[in-house]
Amino acid sequence: MTGHVSKTSHVPKGRPSSLAKKAAKRAMAKVNSNPKRASGHLERVVQSVNDATKRLSQPDSTVSVATKSSKRKSRDTVGPWKLGKTLGKGSSGRVRLAKNMETGQLAAIKIVPKKKAFVHCSNNGTVPNSYSSSMVTSNVSSPSIASREHSNHSQTNPYGIEREIVIMKLISHTNVMALFEVWENKSELYLVLEYVDGGELFDYLVSKGKLPEREAIHYFKQIVEGVSYCHSFNICHRDLKPENLLLDKKNRRIKIADFGMAALELPNKLLKTSCGSPHYASPEIVMGRPYHGGPSDVWSCGIVLFALLTGHLPFNDDNIKKLLLKVQSGKYQMPSNLSSEARDLISKILVIDPEKRITTQEILKHPLIKKYDDLPVNKVLRKMRKDNMARGKSNSDLHLLNNVSPSIVTLHSKGEIDESILRSLQILWHGVSRELITAKLLQKPMSEEKLFYSLLLQYKQRHSISLSSSSENKKSATESSVNEPRIEYASKTANNTGLRSENNDVKTLHSLEIHSEDTSTVNQNNAITGVNTEINAPVLAQKSQFSINTLSQPESDKAEAEAVTLPPAIPIFNASSSRIFRNSYTSISSRSRRSLRLSNSRLSLSASTSRETVHDNEMPLPQLPKSPSRYSLSRRAIHASPSTKSIHKSLSRKNIAATVAARRTLQNSASKRSLYSLQSISKRSLNLNDLLVFDDPLPSKKPASENVNKSEPHSLESDSDFEILCDQILFGNALDRILEEEEDNEKERDTQRQRQNDTKSSADTFTISGVSTNKENEGPEYPTKIEKNQFNMSYKPSENMSGLSSFPIFEKENTLSSSYLEEQKPKRAALSDITNSFNKMNKQEGMRIEKKIQREQLQKKNDRPSPLKPIQHQELRVNSLPNDQGKPSLSLDPRRNISQPVNSKVESLLQGLKFKKEPASHWTHERGSLFMSEHVEDEKPVKASDVSIESSYVPLTTVATSSRDPSVLAESSTIQKPMLSLPSSFLNTSMTFKNLSQILADDGDDKHLSVPQNQSRSVAMSHPLRKQSAKISLTPRSNLNANLSVKRNQGSPGSYLSNDLDGISDMTFAMEIPTNTFTAQAIQLMNNDTDNNKINTSPKASSFTKEKVIKSAAYISKEKEPDNSDTNYIPDYTIPNTYDEKAINIFEDAPSDEGSLNTSSSESDSRASVHRKAVSIDTMATTNVLTPATNVRVSLYWNNNSSGIPRETTEEILSKLRLSPENPSNTHMQKRFSSTRGSRDSNALGISQSLQSMFKDLEEDQDGHTSQADILESSMSYSKRRPSEESVNPKQRVTMLFDEEEEESKKVGGGKIKEEHTKLDNKISEESSQLVLPVVEKKENANNTENNYSKIPKPSTIKVTKDTAMESNTQTHTKKPILKSVQNVEVEEAPSSDKKNWFVKLFQNFSSHNNATKASKNHVTNISFDDAHMLTLNEFNKNSIDYQLKNLDHKFGRKVVEYDCKFVKGNFKFKIKITSTPNASTVITVKKRSKHSNTSSNKAFEKFNDDVERVIRNAGRS
């Protein structure tokens, strides 16, 4: 974070990212065919990078600015909770110990900052207020605000937290961490969670080593029971690992924590998001396939069991690629010291095929578990488990409706539906539209929606505020249940009165308070006879933000005691007494009104009834209507909701104390980074995974999804997973798209289902209960007639809503709620208890990128291992060739994300040829209102176009790279789309991927696995929990490409992966790069689809080797390229097997010793990695975060299925690292030779084996040497000569910015290039003595280096190179005399000035400064600002110019961008300023600012200006 691309002086201090950075992204993204999507993507990426980097480097800065600025008093209390010490800090928040001032109960409060800027957004009335109130949790208040807010504020992604809240409300189990309540104020969310002082199981395991089997099974059994309980709700945790398991040492009880990645698995719908920690993720997740959550959780449990019993992990490697491949293969070493039962259970859990994997029920019946059932502790637990089983809570088949039967609510109209609960259901149902869920709730048949609605309603009722003595609770509940008609009337009255009182007393607006307010109001109006008239306690609105109304309620203890017996599905932790705080701008305006009316007696379930029915749940659901208790519950008891009983329950201090005493968990790890702060919070904060669009399944997944489409009810399953929803909600109109898809598909099926169109409730009832997705093998084929019918039914309402507001119910309340928000402005933000409130889903317009990668055709070829024959060490250049159809792989560098320029002339200039216009935009952009089905008929066409786009998507394929390349440019070594396209240096040894599919390959797609056999060994830092031991010979899975099967000297078949997988080291390596581990290499990446891989997909030897190598390194002409199209590597290209002795088998045996000291496969030191906590990766920007291999668990989200891993980082990101010194200490790049290994080419410049390849080589830059990135880029530009960049110190230089264009221009624009080459050669020959750049070379390879010397004259290189110098004849400059002169010139120019003392320099600067002031030239052109900007950047790239973005400003129609530039040779600097003028012309000002000047630099400057003039003139002609 030390340096930004733009100077800090240009950026306000408090900004999370510099203005220049954001502006650059916006400006460059404009050129993209879909600027809105591109800029959004870039901003998400950069924001996630910023957040993650801050988390790593400045953990203290994660506290929100708003919190810091708020008064100390505001942070001392939250409702009844007195805040204590900070237990831990995370990227997006912190966890503090808290004590209930009323009950003395301890809790851990997770404080998640909300960003400002969404308080007053809804006042314009453009969206219903209830909708805009979702600002509280979605950080986006309206479509117009979304982009602005996102660009200005780091995304804490409260939406993910909101999902976590909803899930935790549904789950109450002794082995699951409890959520007591949720509070909020203007700037923060407060999740009041169980406090456990025992710490994480991870810490315990680290301190104790492997556990005795008896103890391990004791804990494991609890884990399985908790997981099984979650599965009974169709909820899958998806991130089970010791770090997320809290241990109450006193009670020896496990608590499952961190539901940030949990998801509801919908019937007939597979989960698609690859998430979790790589070490614990199941193979199906690692392969990026759709999967059932249940079996995946079981796999994770198996890994945890293995770790408990052995002290290390079965699959472990510092190199993420290797780790994932190990998991994918499912091969591990079973320790011989385990008992036979343990080995048997582990072998049944760790099965690759999820359908054959044991289930949680079977685990609990396994002999290993039964073996220790007689333990005294286990007897108690067994009794508890028995109770849970009686409630159907421990079944693992996820047939929710068969297992849980709480009292089911009967709803008769939309008006009865509680908006906050509806919002929660939307979250759980992955963004399904409100109309569809509403339709399901109103249907007679039983449905999962109704069940969850009932459960959430019960939770809400129990956590509502009681405003009267609870002694009357039960009594009043009974009375009210008898008077259903009166209660309905009363609820109406209450609603009206509540609305009136709401206007009169804004302070008490909150969904929780409104229940009580309504109740009291109803009583005051005497409109009800049936409702207990004893609720007369006044509603106290307190003005202080966090003060508490401590209304004593001595009589509530009885009711509370009864409440404790309620089913676990409803946490009984009460909220504080009368939390009547002013509703900060946030929430509830209209929603609370709605809940006011809805949550009134009508919708609440009486506690007693629900308790009965839940305990009864052995009774099948279809009998539900016949059960008197249930029947009364659903009809009358539900209406009796005003019953203060439920309200009082939440108040009972006794109840709180009792429950909490039993469950203290979480946050014991104050000493070791609290589990919360780093896991739950940071995951949520960076939930970019959720922000990314999830596309249709890959071809391999297609069959499953087709089945899904056939059978799945659209209302329940939108085509996108929940994470898509997050992305779309926050950044676009994906919600609209989702609904369109649902409705379109529904419409297509309507005709097919016409005969079934008569919705039969009995059938429906069975359907949903039977359709549970959890059945591991049960795919989408579980559909039921009912669901279809329901969906027809639910679908129709939305069909006719094209003209309606998305939330018509609240439209009329807009004015009221906006005024309410305005009233709130001047006052201090109050803390609101939002335990039961949720904000409306943000329905922003956005883009949905559709990608279906079809690459299976190449598998055949790729399966053929390439012959092994030692060849000279070759360096291959990374080349990305643009493909007409290729969807651009989104990169962090804005310039990477630019599709073809609008101006065809500009395009030709950039790419050296005019290629055909792409048939369609790279992006699929569909707009539509979420609730308008006008475009329903377009579904089919849209899908078709999506297919074409998908096929046009150009997956980044890794082609063979020389085995020496330790780093293989982390970014450029993108393996074809899903497979391992993530640089391992970012993936800490135990991180949690939010989306592993990004880096995982499809099973059928082996080609992407064809990681160059040559890829050099990576220098992986450390193997957590592992140490290298005997290798196991494993046959690679079918999806492992045969290309990888290059055998090393070990001869172990499993080791074939190590060459490639070593290519990227652990993140720690980024921090301490050994100089002897660098190898210069390159690979040629084809950014092409499998069908389009014909363009130069084969790796070429770089020109640094002997002449014959140079010859082969020459880029193949376009005509020849198709020959190599079938595979991603040249068939005749043989890969050197150097360093076989050092290669390791990626499937190395696990250490059997307790120490678990893992030996890194790299040369870096080993460390006992047990202490490194798993990092949950939830960010798509993982590739840009240097996660230290420390105990910090960083949560990064990687969930952008639609975009390839960025191959370059932006200038801004590079500059953050402050990698290069201002002036190179030595212009010659000779240090690198010492860092190359073995018998490498003299010219093999060391490329960092770590993540540095992605940015720049830290060592290179810090030592004043050119970064390998620049070397790589220049070598791409000049295939036959070593780029002059090697000797230059690039300033935050971005690598390979426009390799495609350069390559194309080399190939296609041959004539023009030749002609310019000739001129350039002449020019260079004239100036050779002064301008030829120094080249990295060894004496023995002088000839080769000479060839590499087709360098461009120092400055002249700059622009000349753009078109001409790109591939100037190497022979022209291959003479040794030139080399000599180059060195001399070096001494003359830059070094000369450097060696003078300060006094001489001072005067020299004075004299040269005068020259510099005069050396300025303006170029006026009629091309657009963006085109001029792009041309300039391209010129920089092609002319070996290092540049630094100084300023970029787009204000009031005026666009200005400034760059500080420097030629790769010498100290010759200049400025370029591009300004748009009101008359639509653009002025490019080139100003020389070098402190010293000479003839050659002046000449070069003139030449550069001529080049600029020529380029813009050519562009302007069009």
From Swiss-Prot:
InterPro entries: Kinase-like_dom_sf (IPR011009), Prot_kinase_dom (IPR000719), Protein_kinase_ATP_BS (IPR017441), Ser/Thr_kinase_AS (IPR008271). Residues 599-611 have a biased composition (Low complexity). Residues 81-369 form the Protein kinase domain. ATP binds at L87, G88, K89, G90, S91, S92, G93, R94, V95, K110. It catalyses: L-seryl-[protein] + ATP = O-phospho-L-seryl-[protein] + ADP + H(+); L-threonyl-[protein] + ATP = O-phospho-L-threonyl-[protein] + ADP + H(+). Keywords: ATP-binding, Kinase, Nucleotide-binding, Phosphoprotein, Serine/threonine-protein kinase, Transferase. The keyword Kinase applies. It is found in: Bud neck. GO terms for cellular component: cellular bud neck; cellular bud neck septin ring; cytoplasm; nucleus. Residues 1-43, 55-83, 467-502, 599-651, 741-783, 856-898, 1005-1030, 1150-1170, 1220-1243, 1259-1291 are annotated as: Disordered. Signal peptide: none annotated. Its EC number is 2.7.11.1. The active site is at D239. GO terms for biological process: G2/M transition of mitotic cell cycle; mitotic morphogenesis checkpoint signaling; negative regulation of diacylglycerol biosynthetic process; protein catabolic process; protein localization to septin ring; regulation of cell cycle. Residues 55-68, 492-501, 759-774, 1222-1243, 1265-1278 have a biased composition (Polar residues). The keyword Cytoplasm does not apply. Pfam families: Pkinase. Residues 746-758, 856-876 have a biased composition (Basic and acidic residues). Belongs to the protein kinase superfamily. CAMK Ser/Thr protein kinase family. NIM1 subfamily. This is Probable serine/threonine-protein kinase HSL1.
